[in-house]
Structures are given as C-alpha cells and as structure tokens.
C-alpha cells in the first residue's frame, strides 16, 4: 500500500454485536493489521429512536472478547479526529457546515413535504407501476414558497439533488467495477432530517473524509448506498476511499440473508460466548465467511490470519453459515488446549452464570469445582464441541446419586446373563472396598475380567451402565475417578440390588 491505511468499524448502538457486524469488524481488523494500518472504532448513533442502552458497551466488550482491538475510538481518542460518536460530532457542527456548503452551491435544497404528501406520492407511483422515487417537488422552489411553508409550522428535511443521467462508478476490491446511473437511484435523497440530525449516507461521508479513512470494508447490503455517498464526495470535491463490499452471511436453510428471526442459528457473539465457544474458534470461523486463504487448511491462529490475509481473495458469493463446521472448528481448538486452560475458561463461564447450567454449579466450593472440571475435561476433551457440554457433564457427575438409571437395559437381556453381570459388579465392588487409596481403577477392571473370565461388552457394558446410566461411555475408569470411592461403591451396590431383586 502506497498510502497509510486507515479503516473503520462503525456500528450503530441499536443492538448487540451480531455475527454480521462481527464479520465486518473482523475483516477491517485483518486489513488494518496486515497492512500495518490504523483501526478506528466509530459509533454511528444518529438513529436516536433505535439506540439501545448498553448497545455501545456490548459492542466494545464483545469485540474485545473476540480478540479485535482498535487504535482510535471513543475510549482511545486522537485529538486530530475526535470525537468518535456521530451525536457528539453533530453537536460540534461538523456536519452542518458541509450541509450549508451544498445548500449554497444549489446541490442541496429544503423539502417541506409532509409525511401524508409523501405517502400519497408513493401510493400514486405504486398505482402507476412506477418504481418508488422522490419526484423533486421542492427542488428549485423560491424563498417565498419556503417561508410560506415555515409559516405553517413545517420543518424541512434537506435533500441532495442528483444530476440527470450521471454515472457513479468505483472499482470494488471484492466485486470489481461497479456502476450506477443517477436516474435509477430513487430520486433526490435526504441528507439532513427535520430534527437537524444528518442521515447515515451524509454523516458517513463527512466522517470518513475528515477522519482520513482510506478503505471502507462493509457488507454487500451497503452497495446501494455507495453511489449516493460517491455523489456527495463529488459534490464536495473530495476523493472517495477505496470500497470493499464483503459477502453477506446467508442461512443455508432459507438461502436468504441471516435474519434475527432465524431462531435455528445463534445470532449474537454474546450467545456464542455463553454457550462455551472459544473466541479463537469464532475468530477463525468468521474469517472464513466470505474469504479464504490459499490452500485447504482451515485452522489458523489470529496471528497467522493477519499474515496471510489478502483482500483480493474475498468472495463475491454469499457466505453460508455452516453450524456443523463451527462446532467442528471449536472442537479442534478444545482438543488442542491444555486441561488447565480449559478449566480456567469453563470456570469463567460458570462465574458469569449466563446459563442455568452454569448457575447450578456455582453452589459447589471453588476448589471442589475446579477438581470436578479438570476430571470432566480429561474424560470428555476429545468428544465435546463446546464448553457448555463440559458444564452439563460436570453437573451430571456431581448429581449422579440423585439420578435414576434404567437397569432394564441389561436385566434379563439374552445377550447378558444376569449372573455374569452380577459377577462383574460384585467383583469390582470387592476390589474397591479392599483396595488402597491409590488403587488403579483401570487395572482393577482388568483383574475383574481375568477373575471372572468375562471380557469385552460383557465386562464393560454393566460397568458403563452402573456409573453413567448408559451402556455406551468413555473410559469408565476415568469416570470412576471423578466420583469419590464411596460414590463408586454405592453406584455398584444400587445395580447389584436391582439385579438381585
């Protein structure tokens, strides 16, 4: 890059960090870090009616959790570019002076149309099978007509006037050459609302220009905004930044843009966090939504992704959200981590108490809970997809004596003679009762098999059922180690009594 790269992630605080917003933030982050540039966090809060409490804080918190940091923003102001919230920038008059410049040039004008008049215009266009567009009714009106409207108490919006038959073009990093004609853009558009707040399309241009933004990476749903923004750049005599419109994330079931109404997919980064997805895995997964490096490899650390990132490998096609791929990827990260690291992260989830499963484990003393988690992870590290499953397993083991097992799975089963089942159970019970504190459970089970002459399914199915309630289980001696010796003996005794009765 010849110029010093400056990119921005500019969310609206109208909700929490959505997977689509996270994708946009992540690609801006990779771009900035790969090209040794500057990442700016800007808050676009002009839509005051839709802003939600803690929306901005949620954005920052979840970006940090993902591993995305920024160089400038509300909490890291550069005096040259601050402030970083559009509401604050509006109070300082940053936008209005450029609005006034366009008014003075005759490129912008005041529109006193009422909502009723605009609705009537749209209905008429619909009846005539015309595409919806503003008909320019207030363009070129005299000062007298404007004063007459104001005398009626009407407050104007300010519209940008498109020249006739003018092409707005740009070379998009992801999509190549893109062109729109001014006659097909819906007519003159509002750049300042009647309450004095600039609209998105105007504020974003002023902000990107005055903050020296060099590259704009954003979702493909913004493509229709880009010609309007280029029109403003041209009218103010400014050079526009380089655009890159990244693929939208689609639901593979509906084959449409992922919607907050799609209940089959977790929508917000905070939800992934509380379900026990690792931030490294989410970062890796999102990086592959609409982009891919050279080769077949899929597991990359953040540092590796920064190194190999090439924006020219951005896809034009939608990115389909593959839940199975995410679960697989998260499982790979779980398998690669140490038991101590996974224990610490699972403990964090429990302390945060964002799920009912996590809240239940908060009643266990921390030292005891830590030991329970370590042993649970040792057993299940190879077969869980997310840490919430570790929490669920841990609770199941902690409350094992409160559960009822269905011993009929083996009782009077023609494949398992009752006397053989009892021989296995009683044999292991005796070894537990008579063994030392450091008894090797794996060796004890082997000795029971040798003593009884029972092996394979005949040996392990009864023990699996006794200790887990299922004939299928991981290494049973590791599960026995999760319980106390007394609990192991009681679980064996319960099944023995069930078979003897």
From Swiss-Prot:
Its EC number is 6.1.1.17. A motif ('KMSKS' region) lies at residues 257-261. ATP binds at residue 260. It is found in: Cytoplasm. Coiled coil: none annotated. GO terms for biological process: glutamyl-tRNA aminoacylation. It catalyses: tRNA(Glu) + L-glutamate + ATP = L-glutamyl-tRNA(Glu) + AMP + diphosphate. GO terms for cellular component: cytosol. Pfam families: Anticodon_2, tRNA-synt_1c. Keywords: Aminoacyl-tRNA synthetase, ATP-binding, Cytoplasm, Ligase, Nucleotide-binding, Protein biosynthesis. Monomer. This is Glutamate--tRNA ligase. The lineage of its organism: Bacteria, Bacillati, Bacillota, Bacilli, Lactobacillales.
